[in-house]
């Protein structure tokens, strides 16, 4: 492929995104010929399209002894274009049974999401050869149509961000040819030849042998991946419609769907529900645990199937996702209207509560005393009010509570509670605006 042909293909890919003026286009730089080609193509595109924002990011997780030198070389090449750059070291936590490569990839994507605007497009240098290798890796894992679809040319990312792979149909040979014609500088990572790494084994040992025997084998793999993607898209659209009609709340999976369908359809519906919650999909074994336990679950059974970073629970004829990952904030006295609760979100309280020498405290501790609510008869314990409100047991101790002058006056999800506070004035007659609690996602009840 001629270099202008590659540039035309790149432009077509970006034009399909329906970009808006001021939108951020970000080149993810790894240092290889593919990402350096992406940067060069993007800079050519910038000359004709100055209406967008442009950024190049390189994150060094120091897996290779020469990574610091590589970063310097990559940074010098990027800055020669006069583009805004971010070059950072990256600490990569590696969990049990997680490969170094997978941990590095997750950490890179997480940090790049933090460094980019909400509607940014992240441009990746993955190409035809990468797509073929990905298909084989998914095949090895026993994946269905979704996994065998491999990588999408354009896919949603975090928030309104998108990932874009303009070179996905281009061979590595054509990319190298372009890089040489453009006199680009890139890094040759010697670990790419280590066949102990699965992808490298496929790249150097398996795929060349298959294409030597069947020259069109690679094209057949790409066609199969595309057909799997189309099949998955149709299936998802049909399942989402069925799920939407049965749901009362987007965050819940109604168990009535399980009783109406076969085991295969049950698993498919559960997958599409979890995908809609933006969680990683469970393994087949985990999905089967969820399906089987849900069929016999009761509110007293305390069903909990642990998945990757979240668990699936049962409450009131529905399944819920619980992604609590940390400890609750410590109790604290409030002197300001806005409180940052870390991963538990933010809380904004009315200024009136901070006047008249009031002592205002934030707590997550459930009181055993009985409380009254404005306009409601009788007094109940807080746990009973929470139960009546339909809040699951595991979330009842995760509600921010305001304590004014030693008395509970407000609970997230329940609103104001009533008692005499100032000059025998009933608290509910003060008509204060509700505090505003915005969860960061640690509370699965946030979507109700």
From Swiss-Prot:
Catalytic activity: cytidine(34) in tRNA(Ile2) + L-lysine + ATP = lysidine(34) in tRNA(Ile2) + AMP + diphosphate + H(+)
UniProt cross-references to SMART domains, sorted A to Z: TilS_C
CDD domains, per the entry: TilS_N
EC number: 6.3.4.19
Gene Ontology biological process terms in this record: tRNA modification
Binding-site residues, ATP: 30-35
Ligase recorded as keyword: yes
Keywords linked to the UniProt accession: ATP-binding, Cytoplasm, Ligase, Nucleotide-binding, tRNA processing
Highest rank taxon of the organism: Bacteria
MF terms in GO: ATP binding; tRNA(Ile)-lysidine synthase activity
Principal EC category: ligase
Cell location: Cytoplasm
Location (main, coarse): cytoplasm
Gene Ontology CC: one annotated term: cytoplasm
PANTHER family: TRNA(ILE)-LYSIDINE SYNTHASE-RELATED (PTHR43033:SF1)
Record-stated family: Belongs to the tRNA(Ile)-lysidine synthase family.
Domain notes: The N-terminal region contains the highly conserved SGGXDS motif, predicted to be a P-loop motif involved in ATP binding.
Summary of the function given for this chain in its UniProt record: Ligates lysine onto the cytidine present at position 34 of the AUA codon-specific tRNA(Ile) that contains the anticodon CAU, in an ATP-dependent manner. Cytidine is converted to lysidine, thus changing the amino acid specificity of the tRNA from methionine to isoleucine.
HAMAP family hit by this protein: tRNA_Ile_lys_synt
Protein name: tRNA(Ile)-lysidine synthase
Organism: Idiomarina loihiensis (strain ATCC BAA-735 / DSM 15497 / L2-TR)
Gene (name only): tilS
